[in-house]
């Protein structure tokens, strides 16, 4: 956990929230009561940007929760895998939803070979993928630009593929924004 937090501290601006050119809200889930906490402009500002990003990334099987004021925060995707409604409530007239979660299919043989943690990760991926699909299909708010990079075959921890992720994200964004 400390290594990931250190990484976020290095790549994100020191002045954090103030450095953002657009409003940014990051969600995390309270491990105790399951409530959603929002960090950023319009939410809590007493947590650094790096810690908020870490909290929203914390999958306890891999990274421990972020502890703040006696509460433990985990991956915000457990309750809001695409926070479309919150973006609308924050005043967005057009919403850009970027979906980088795992898709519908997975290599069962590979998952089973990797063991129970991989099975757990795949179960979580299926649940959140289905929820993201429902959120997009049922969206009745302001215009939604849905960006879905092609990431099938890649996993959460494929750090060696960052260049591909950036290029694919750029391609998917251009495609979505061009209509």
Regions found by a protein language model. Name each.
Residues 1-179:
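Patatin-like phospholipase
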């Amino acid at each position: 956990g400390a290594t990931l937090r250190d990484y976020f501290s290095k790549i994100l601006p020191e002045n954090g929230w103030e450095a953002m050119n657009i409003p940014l809200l990051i969600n995390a889930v309270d491990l105790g009561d399951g409530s959603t906490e929002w960090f950023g402009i319009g939410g809590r500002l007493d947590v650094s940007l790096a810690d908020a990003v870490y909290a929203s990334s914390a999958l306890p099987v891999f990274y421990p929760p972020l502890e703040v004021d006696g509460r433990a925060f985990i991956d915000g995707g457990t309750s809001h895998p695409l926070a479309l409604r919150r973006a609308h409530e924050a005043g967005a007239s057009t919403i850009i939803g970027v979906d980088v979660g795992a898709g519908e299919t997975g290599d069962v043989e590979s998952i089973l070979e990797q063991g129970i943690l991989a099975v757990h990760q795949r179960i979580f991926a299926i649940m959140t993928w289905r929820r993201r699909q429902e959120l997009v299909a049922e969206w009745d708010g302001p215009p939604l630009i849905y960006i879905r990079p092609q990431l099938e075959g890649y996993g959460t921890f494929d750090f060696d593929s960052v260049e591909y992720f950036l290029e694919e994200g750029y391609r998917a964004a251009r495609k979505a924004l061009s209509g």
